[in-house]
Curated annotation (Swiss-Prot):
Belongs to the histidinol dehydrogenase family. Keywords: Amino-acid biosynthesis, Histidine biosynthesis, Metal-binding, NAD, Oxidoreductase, Zinc. GO terms for cellular component: cytosol. Its EC number is 1.1.1.23. GO terms for biological process: L-histidine biosynthetic process. This is Histidinol dehydrogenase. CDD domains: Histidinol_dh (cd06572). It comes from Mesorhizobium japonicum (strain LMG 29417 / CECT 9101 / MAFF 303099) (Mesorhizobium loti (strain MAFF 303099)). Zn(2+) binds at Q259, H262, D361, H420. The active site is at E327, H328.
Length: 430
């Protein structure tokens, strides 16, 4: 049973603060082991990948090959469900259409002194996409990472995916193909991250790595950061639903369980101004748990990390929503637009009673790679902007240099950097 927090209780602030700091992941001390893996991949290249893949995934890359071939991809189309392929293509088109609107524009202008300033955007040359294997192997996540990269203009999009027993989910391969992935390798874990960062005989290095993974993958991304860029360190999924008593309790329960079924560490939270409705949702959750194939996982998530928060008014929920800063926020209330206008922190917001978060996971068009663990307070979801970089531009002529030079020389002198001042003065015979 999820916990219940009542804003009217005297100890609410203390309990709510404790709730915000609840740790949902068991931290494994894997840094030392990951450091060894990275060092070995840097030293031994493909040989290390082959050995680690045999050890961890029971797959023989000597016979299978490290790279996934065109024939492998063609075979994936033959074995994948045609309806699922059609749905992936539908989702791909919507994701592409939305992300094309995110392309930033270059700018050049001349200020009052005649100085030209501006910036230009260029795509990152090569990006690596990590895709988890096994039960966490989601074709939709391939689309969400690869499509924005291609829209941004990234020429080389490299996917690494573990192949337990030599098998890769065929829909993952189809998703990679239809979204423009240019290379696919059947390696996973920290050794795959090392290969993307430093390269091997088969895998050329990339400039940035995106995509979720387990504790080893997360540690590897942290350790290679600086050599390459990374997107984020993603934690367990989470949803916060703000709902009044006008909602269908079964709908809201289904939304809460849609997150809870992801992982035992996922978190589902309901904030309501109607205690009776909150109880009805809890009862609906218990009923629906009995019918879910992943009911055991969802039940553990709801029991350990779920919450129902009772507030006096929907307006009183606003500061709590901003403090929680959830990955997903559903606003199933009458004035969802007005509430949104006063909100600050959320990875993504789903407005109204007919916008379940699951639509955003698949076919809404917006990206489902979002900040978790309250990091929406300072970061954003994945977008085209994650795959481009901005270069500033400055242009002066002799007249503009004469105008700006005195202040530049004075600042260089104040900072004790004489060569800086000289590089300006020498052009003006000063």
């Amino acid at each position: 049973m999820a916990i219940t927090l009542r804003q009217s209780d005297a100890d609410f602030e203390q309990r709510f603060a404790a709730f915000l700091t609840t740790k949902r992941e068991v931290s494994e001390d894997v840094d030392a082991g990951v450091r060894q893996i990275i060092a070995r991949v840097r030293a031994e290249g493909d040989a290390a990948l082959i050995d680690y893949t045999q050890r961890f995934d029971r797959a023989d890359l000597k016979s299978l090959g490290i790279a996934v071939s065109k024939q492998d991809i063609a075979a994936a189309y033959e074995t994948a469900d045609p309806k699922a392929i059609e749905a992936l293509e539908f989702a791909r088109d919507r994701i592409r259409s939305h992300h094309e609107r995110q392309r930033p524009k270059d700018d050049r202008y001349t200020d009052a002194t005649g100085v030209e300033l501006g910036w230009r955007w260029t795509a990152i040359e090569a990006v690596g996409l990590y895709v988890p294997g096994g039960t966490a192997s989601y074709p939709s996540s391939v689309l969400m990472n690869a499509v924005p990269a291609r829209v941004a203009g990234v020429e080389r999009v490299v996917m690494v995916v573990p192949a337990p027993g030599g098998i890769i989910n065929p829909l993952v391969l189809v998703a990679a193909d239809i979204s423009g992935v240019t290379e696919i390798y059947r390696v996973g874990g920290a050794h795959a991250i090392a290969a993307l960062a430093y390269g091997t005989e088969t895998i050329k290095p990339v400039a940035k790595i995106v995509g979720p993974g387990n504790a080893y993958v997360a540690a590897a991304k942290r350790q290679v950061f600086g050599t390459v860029g990374i997107d984020m360190i993603a934690g367990p999924s989470e949803v916060l639903v703000v709902a009044d008593g006008s909602n269908n309790a079964d709908w809201i329960a289904a939304d809460l369980l849609a997150q809870a079924e992801h992982d035992v560490s996922a978190q589902s939270i309901l904030i309501t101004d109607d205690p009776a409705f909150g109880k009805a949702v809890e009862q609906a959750v218990e009923r629906q748990l009995q019918t879910l194939p992943r009911g055991e996982t969802a039940a553990a998530s709801w029991r350990d990390f779920g919450a129902v928060i009772e507030v006096a008014t929907i307006e009183a929920a606003l500061p709590l929503v901003d403090r929680i800063a959830a990955e997903h926020v559903e606003l199933a209330i009458d004035d969802a637009e007005g509430f949104l206008s006063r909100m600050r922190n959320a990875g993504a917001v789903f407005l109204g009673r007919h916008t379940p978060e699951a639509i955003g996971d698949y076919v809404g068009g917006s990206n489902h790679v979002l900040p978790t663990a309250r990091s929406a307070r300072f970061s954003s979801g994945l977008s085209v902007l994650d795959f481009v970089k901005r270069t500033s531009i400055l242009k002066l002529g002799p007249e503009q240099l004469r105008v700006l030079a005195p202040a530049a020389i004075a600042l260089a002198k104040a900072e004790g950097l004489d060569a800086h001042g000289r590089s300006v003065a020498i052009r003006l015979n000063m």
